C-alpha cells in the first residue's frame, strides 16, 4: 500500500453496537459530521472510474448545493433488489434527476429503473430525519426512509454516474470484480 496516499487522512471508526440498519449506523456518526455535507461509500458496491463516483457526486453537490445519490440503470426485473427513485424529468445537468420519491426494494410497479447504488453525498440535515425513524423494511432503520422525508423539505438529486459497477455483496459479482481488476493489472 502506498502510505503517501494516507499521510493527510484521518480515519475514525464508530461502532454500531447492534445491527439496526444503515440509517441507524449513519445516525451514530452525527457527532463527527456536525454541519458538514458528507460522503457515504458502501463497500459491497465497487465502482471503477476516473474520476471516481464520489468525485462525480461531489461535483454535482457543489453545483446544486443539495444532497446527491448515485444511481444506475437496472433491468426492470431486478428493481426489487434496490432502492429505486421516482423522477419527474431530468434536471438541466446531464445524467441528473431531481427525486420525486424513493422506494426501498419495490416488490412490484417500480417507479423507474434507476436504482440507488452505495454512493451518497448528503447534507447534515439527514440526521434530523434519521432521529425519529422507526424500523421498517427488515426491521431496520432505513436510510431510504430518511431521504424520503428529506424530499418534503429540500431537493435531492439522483446522479447517473459514469463507471463500471460490481456487486461485491454476491459471490458472482465479487469474482467478476477480481477478474476485471486482474485483467487491468495484467494489461498494464
Show which residues each predicted segment covers.
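Catalytic-core segments of class I nucleotidyltransferases/pyrophosphorylases
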Residues: 39, 58-59, 91-166, 171-188
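Conserved beta-loop-beta/alpha segment of the NTase-like Rossmann-fold superfamily
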Residues: 1-87, 122, 131-133
Amino acid at each position: 500500500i502506498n502510505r503517501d496516499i494516507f499521510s493527510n487522512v484521518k480515519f475514525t471508526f464508530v461502532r454500531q453496537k447492534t445491527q439496526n440498519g444503515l440509517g441507524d449506523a449513519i445516525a451514530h456518526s452525527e457527532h463527527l459530521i456536525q454541519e458538514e455535507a458528507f460522503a457515504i461509500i458502501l463497500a459491497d458496491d465497487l465502482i471503477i472510474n476516473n474520476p471516481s463516483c464520489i468525485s462525480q457526486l461531489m461535483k454535482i453537490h457543489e453545483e446544486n448545493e443539495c444532497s446527491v445519490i448515485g444511481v444506475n440503470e437496472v433491468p426492470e426485473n431486478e428493481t426489487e433488489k434496490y432502492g429505486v427513485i421516482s423522477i419527474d424529468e431530468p434536471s438541466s445537468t446531464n445524467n441528473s434527476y431531481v427525486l420525486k420519491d424513493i422506494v426501498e426494494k419495490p416488490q412490484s410497479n417500480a417507479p423507474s429503473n434507476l436504482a440507488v447504488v452505495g454512493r451518497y453525498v448528503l447534507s447534515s440535515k439527514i440526521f434530523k430525519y434519521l432521529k425519529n425513524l422507526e424500523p421498517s423494511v427488515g426491521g431496520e432503520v432505513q436510510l431510504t426512509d430518511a431521504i424520503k422525508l428529506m424530499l418534503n423539505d429540500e431537493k435531492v438529486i439522483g446522479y447517473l454516474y459514469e463507471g463500471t459497477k460490481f456487486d461485491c455483496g454476491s459471490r458472482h459479482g465479487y469474482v467478476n470484480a477480481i477478474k476485471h481488476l486482474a485483467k487491468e493489472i495484467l494489461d498494464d
